[in-house]
Amino acid sequence: VELGSTAQVGDIKYRDLNGDGVINADDQGMISEYGGNPRIQYGFGLNINYKKFDLGVFFNGSAMRKIMLTGIHPFGESDYNIFKFVAKDYWTEANPNPNAAYPRLGLQKANSDNNVVPSTFWMRNGNFLRFKTLEIGYRFCRYGRIYVTGDNLAVFSPFKEWDPELEWYKYPLQRTFNIGCLLYTSD
């Protein structure tokens, strides 16, 4: 293998795509024609009024989206911390699980570069549906309304490591709740 460093037990295995018996840069190909850009972004909402009550909801999401786990690799000499999801299931000599979720860790860049080559191994499904906003209100008189709102209430996604809408190093979107009262001066 000539993709970064000499392959060792516990490393990611690569395919000889061009069939020449050598795994090198000539065996690399496009793995996602859209990269991290989703092919579909969507949003939908609903507002309902019934007597003195009102309800509003909004959802947004992304489909046909891929996430590359780049920059998270706990390999080499760069003082990287290890993400919990990597630390829970990686290959070691003490636990040589051939089905470990992540390859062996390396302390020296020279002997672990094989595990950081961009490949489908690091690609994840980044589809998500976010329950973005909920607002419930009550008009208690002709000139007044009380309400409660919630933002970023839930995210449904097969990708569980972090918010699929953001990169791993970004501060996550906060879940917020508000209670308010509106007083109108006229119709």
Model-based region annotation:
Residues 52-56, 142-146:
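Repeated loop/turn-to-beta-strand initiation elements of outer-membrane beta-barrel proteins
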Residues 38-42, 123, 127-132, 173-177:
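Residues that define the transmembrane beta-barrel architecture of outer-membrane proteins
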Residues 50-52, 61-65, 133, 150-157:
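Transmembrane beta-strands of outer-membrane beta-barrel pores
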Residues 45-47, 135-137, 149, 180-182:
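Outer-membrane beta-barrel architecture
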Residues 184-187:
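Conserved small/polar residues in nucleotide/adenosyl-binding loops
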Residues 58-60, 147-151, 182:
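Transmembrane beta-strands of outer-membrane beta-barrel proteins
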Residues 7-11, 62-145:
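Extracytoplasmic gating/loop element in the C-terminal half of outer-membrane beta-barrel translocons
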Residues 1-36:
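Conserved small-residue
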